[in-house]
Amino acid sequence: YSCICNQGLRVLESPLKREGNTYVVDWDDFEAKCADKKTTLFLLCNPHNPAGRVWTKDELARMNEICMRHDVKVISDEIHCELIMPGYVFTPFATVNADCQRNSVVFNSPTKNFNIAGLQIANIICADKEWYRRIDRAINIFEVCDVNPFGPLALEAAYNESEDWINELMPYIADNYALLKDTFAKEVPSYEVLKLEGTYL
C-alpha cells in the first residue's frame, strides 16, 4: 500500500472472515468501513489474492450497493481473472450491472495469467469520463505510463492467440493444488488447505 501512504492517505482494512474451508466478506464490518466519512475508495481483489475466492455476481453486486450507498468508488484489481479453477466462473466487476460499471475502475493485465510480468503492460478500464480524465492525468504526472515497446505486442498476443496456454495451464495448477492438499493431509494433517477457487497462490 505504499503508493496510498505516500500520498498522505490511510489504508482502512476490512478483513475477510473464515467460514468453513473458505473466506467470506464480513458484511457488517465492510459496511461500517464504507460508512466512515474518510473512506472514498474500495480496493477489491477479484479474484481474491491470497484467499483464492472467486466472487459471485451477487457478492459483487452487494459490495457495490454498499459502496454506492456511502459514495465510495470501487477499484477492482482483476489481474488473476484468467486463473480460475474448474467449476468456477469469473465475473468482471463492471459487467455485474450498470451501477457497477459506472462506479468502478478496473485494473487488469496479462502479466500473471501469461507469465509476462517483465514486459510491464496493463489495462485501466473506466466508464466514468471524469475519473478517466483524472486517471490519465495522474499516470502522466507520475510517469507510470511509459510503455515497454514489446508490451503492447505481448498483450495482443496473450489476449488473441493464447487460449491454448490457459487451457493447458489451469488443469496443471489444479493438479498441483490436489497434490498439495494430498501431501498436507498425509504429512501435516494438523494444517488445513483451504478451498481454492482461483489464482495460483
Model-derived features with residue positions:
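Structural signature of PLP-dependent enzymes
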Residues: 133-140, 158-181
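Active-site PLP attachment segment
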Residues: 96-134
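A short helix->loop->beta-strand "cap" motif at the edges of active sites that frequently abuts
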Residues: 9, 69-73, 101-102
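Substrate-binding/gating loop at the entrance of the active-site cleft, primarily
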Residues: 1-11
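Structural motif of enzymes handling amino- and sulfur-group chemistry
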Residues: 120, 146-169
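Active-site phosphate-binding strand-loop segment of PLP-dependent enzymes
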Residues: 16-88
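Conserved glycine-rich beta-strand-loop-beta hairpin in the small C-terminal domain of fold type I
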Residues: 149-152, 156, 171-181, 192-201
